[in-house]
Amino acid sequence: MGGKTFMLMAGGTGGHIFPALAVADSLRVRGHHVIWLGSKDSMEERIVPQYGIRLETLAIKGIRGNGIKRKLMLPFTLYKTVREAQRIIRKHRVECVIGFGGFVTFPGGLAAKLLGVPIVIHEQNAVAGLSNRHLSRWAKRVLYAFPKAFSHEGGLVGNPVRADISNLPVPAERFQGREGRLKILVVGGSLGADVLNKTVPQALALLPEEVRPQMYHQSGRNKLGNLQADYDALGVKAECVEFITDMVSAYRDADLVICRAGALTIAELTAAGLGALLVPYPHAVDDHQTANARFMVQAEAGLLLPQTQLTAEKLAEILGSLNREKCLKWAENARTLALPHSADDVAEAAIACAA
């Protein structure tokens, strides 16, 4: 068997899982072997095997805000999961582990440390997560998507995104020849964002019909009927879908996006070159979505609107002030932030550490 064996540690949310999948592809294209360490009964348990990657799981869940009993059990749980992770590393003869975040990353990383296996960390958010903060002390390489995610020195590589998004034409080429009302894409993630589903239709109803943007609105799971009913009741035309399967076309055709500010969303916006009205999820750990959003806003690639300030009236005021020229400028500024070779950069750093 040729190639080295890498263990990717990522779980809990798509923001950890999908960048790791992009790195897995980059490693496998180079002839290396990949296994995945995840949690039982998790998103990664449903997604990762579909990509032909061997999945190993630990019985571990989060410790933040989960009650005194779970925290009292933490030392025992950690001991048990670290031992299991050591067994997995030995079994597959892992030569380097790559941590992307999520509960499973810490016991997997600690197991690697105890076995003398090199650790590489990739942090997707502007504020480093708990597992990655701890593991960064032992990591051979610390990589991050946003400047200053860690207090110590590391490597800025961005967040891995799909190549077909990075390969979209530049904003000036996409915007050329566009006329009439703006076309706005609304996405709140695969589960949707209730506050966007409620407020966006109300805001559009406050605008004169002749200046209302054209809306392409992803409702999220099990929310399409209510969203479409709200638009209809307000007399506002919009194209609503439960889930957008072709995000490349959606990004290509949009003038602007209204969305949350998860790390993967920011990475895709910058890769595509799209400005955004960002409404960070207010309950994200360490308020990392607000920090993510500021990254784009500071580059004049969009606006940050805290959820506490999101009203139909405020949103209508913002939408009414926009024009295609401003959206194009935001899109061009967003594209300057893109780091399209992120997956390859992470893979090459890990290969060097495993040498």
UniProtKB/Swiss-Prot annotation:
Disulfide bonds: none annotated. One of its GO terms (molecular function) is undecaprenyldiphospho-muramoylpentapeptide beta-N-acetylglucosaminyltransferase activity. Pathway: Cell wall biogenesis; peptidoglycan biosynthesis. The keyword Repeat does not apply. Its EC number is 2.4.1.227. It is a peripheral membrane protein. It is found in: Cell inner membrane. SUPFAM superfamilies: UDP-Glycosyltransferase/glycogen phosphorylase. InterPro entries: GlcNAc_MurG, Glyco_trans_28_C, GlycoTrans_28_N. One of its GO terms (biological process) is cell division. UDP-N-acetyl-alpha-D-glucosamine binds at T13, G14, G15, N125, R162, S190, I244, Q289. NCBIfam families: murG. This is UDP-N-acetylglucosamine--N-acetylmuramyl-(pentapeptide) pyrophosphoryl-undecaprenol N-acetylglucosamine transferase. The gene is murG.
